[in-house]
Design a protein with these regions (language model features):
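Active-site beta->alpha N-cap acidic-glycine motif
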Residues: 206-286, 300-302
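A short, well-structured beta->alpha microelement
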Residues: 64-89, 384-396
Length: 534
């Protein structure tokens, strides 16, 4: 047992047209990818441990999001809750071995796996079904505690001191190989993953490193997924009280750099007539006019119903319809993975969308948990752009096609300096970003349908003019309604009458003072008359 661890001028248009003509000859343009074509049968995902407080923590969730990126529903459970005969209900099974000291020998799972004839994927561990070992000709060995270099596609990364790593020491020549592991101490090199005849094995998976992408290459083959995949830019953490001027500047800079992008915006359910909300909508109109696509972010649990009273459906559809009424076409949703494992969130909050950007789970509260996830037609795997920066890129241009739809995410920047640094990094990355609008996406509410196809946006079948159409914001907006009054007109007339009476009385009183003063002077200051002549 091992120890555990602006509009261009005419000349500019001519130059641009010439450049585009040349580009069409020398390179294929980047289009938004359609949904991956793969069998939609669900996967049973079993794991022996969640590996909390270890480098492998989060790898089960990562695998769930990878399956979601291929439109596959997942039923996940720990190995110790497996019931005999469960495998018969699934054509695909994936097993994650995070704890080498937890053996499944003699268990109901081991017995069922011995006769299981469906597709099988295992990540880590040396306990394998005999069928898999024979099909792949697989020989495994325990790796020393050593740093290892992982190569996958156009990227590589050095993983430091990987504990409990089992590597492929030998395999059948018919098995497809994906990625490679090179041990620093002695230069030993082995495939990262293998796949053949419905069986696949990967040595290791950890959330937040290159193994996420490396495993996707093997999963694409194992799932028989086909189609073209794209890389998307996703800007997150956008609220009505974010720096909207910075958001507009970001849209201008990305538009000028020719980079299509999407923004994930927080929904607002109340006070949508406030000036702050009107500025929010204007900013989203501007972003859309600068070739940005709009995605509705999942609301915070506290902002929705946690009792399952059905209010979430009306709130989400109301926000979608508010956007559409203001000439904004939302094309999808962004949410944490746990939303797909909740009956209320999936049916009331996500059912409007066929495209969802699934992110790692953050703090959240379930309303009604489900054993299996809800899958979507288009669901890119979301990876922070900062994580990609940890990978070494071989060569300037990317040559190896991606194995899945990938969304590289940023939070809205704190200031313009951080934004400029990020845009400079994006420009130097040579990543061919795809435009979400070029794909086919649909959003349906009870009252309207929003669609995109081939770069066009449609609301109820009518093309949307995405040009700017800002409206003036009422700066004198009354945030509280005027109090209801009775007899206001009558009391208004009465006040006017009283003012006239008081004014007349003051005038008469002043006249009497003047007359009295004159009489006082004549009687007491000059008795007998004035004697001012000599």
């Amino acid at each position: 047992m091992r120890k555990r661890f602006g509009m261009p001028g005419t000349a500019a248009l001519i130059v641009l047209a010439f450049a585009l003509a040349c580009t069409s000859i020398s390179a294929r343009p980047v289009y938004a990818a359609d949904a991956p074509a793969s069998s939609a049968s669900p996967v049973l995902l079993l794991y022996d441990s969640l590996a909390l407080s270890t480098p492998r923590a989060g790898n089960v969730e990562t695998l769930e999001r990878l399956f979601a990126a291929y439109g596959i529903e997942v039923a996940a459970m720990p190995v110790d809750r497996y019931a005999a005969g469960t495998l018969k209900s699934y054509k695909r099974v994936a097993v994650v071995r995070n704890a080498p000291d937890l053996s499944i020998a003699g268990s109901a799972l081991a017995s069922d796996l011995a006769s299981y004839e469906g597709d099988y994927l295992q990540i880590g561990g040396q306990e394998l079904p005999d069928r898999m070992r024979a099909k792949l000709g697989l020989k495994l060995a325990a790796a020393p505690l050593d740093s290892v270099r992982l190569d996958a596609g156009d990227y590589s990364q050095t993983l430091s001191a990987v504990e409990d790593l089992d590597y492929v020491a030998g395999a059948s020549g018919d098995a497809s190989r994906f990625g490679s592991l090179t041990f620093t101490s002695d230069g030993t090199r082995s495939p990262y993953a293998l796949s053949a005849d419905g069986y696949a094995y990967a040595s290791y998976l950890a959330g937040g490193d290159l193994t996420e992408l490396a495993l996707a290459y093997a999963m694409k083959d194992w799932l028989h997924a086909s189609g073209e995949f794209g890389t998307y830019m996703l800007i997150k953490e956008i609220y009505p009280f974010s720096d909207l001027e910075l958001l507009k500047t970001l849209a201008d800079r990305l538009y000028g750099a020719g980079v299509p992008f999407s923004v994930s915006v927080k929904p607002v359910f109340y006070n949508t007539d406030y000036p702050a909300m009107q500025r929010y909508l204007q900013a989203l109109q501007y972003v859309q006019a600068r070739n940005g696509s709009i995605v509705v972010d999942a609301p915070a649990v506290a902002a929705t119903s946690t009792a399952g009273d059905g209010s979430l459906h009306g709130k989400m559809s109301g926000f979608v319809e508010l956007l559409a009424a203001n000439g904004i076409a939302p094309l999808g949703m962004g949410a944490g993975l746990f939303w797909t494992y909740d009956k209320v969130y999936a049916s009331q909050g996500m059912s409007f969308f066929d495209s969802v950007f699934l992110e790692p789970n953050a703090d959240g509260q379930h309303v009604q948990s489900t054993a299996a996830s809800t899958a979507f037609v288009f669901s890119p795997f979301v990876m922070p752009f900062a994580q990609l920066q940890n990978f070494e890129q071989r060569g300037t241009a990317l040559r190896t096609p991606l194995p899945l739809n990938l969304a590289l995410s940023f939070d809205l920047f704190q200031d313009e300096a951080a934004m400029e640094d990020a845009i400079d990094t994006i420009s130097r990355s040579w990543i061919p970003f795809a435009d979400l609008k070029n794909g086919t996406h649909a959003v349906h509410t009870d009252r309207l349908t929003v669609q995109s196809s081939g770069g066009s946006l449609l609301i109820d079948g009518q093309p949307l003019d995405i040009g700017k159409h800002e409206r003036a914001v009422d700066e004198d907006y009354a945030y509280t309604a005027a109090a209801k009054t009775s007899f206001a007109k009558l009391f208004g007339i009465q006040n006017q009458i009283l003012m006239v009476i008081i004014g007349t009385s003051l005038a008469v009183f002043g006249l009497f003072l003047f007359i009295g003063y004159r009489r006082y002077k004549r009687k007491f200051l000059y008795p007998g008359g004035r004697h001012d002549s000599f």
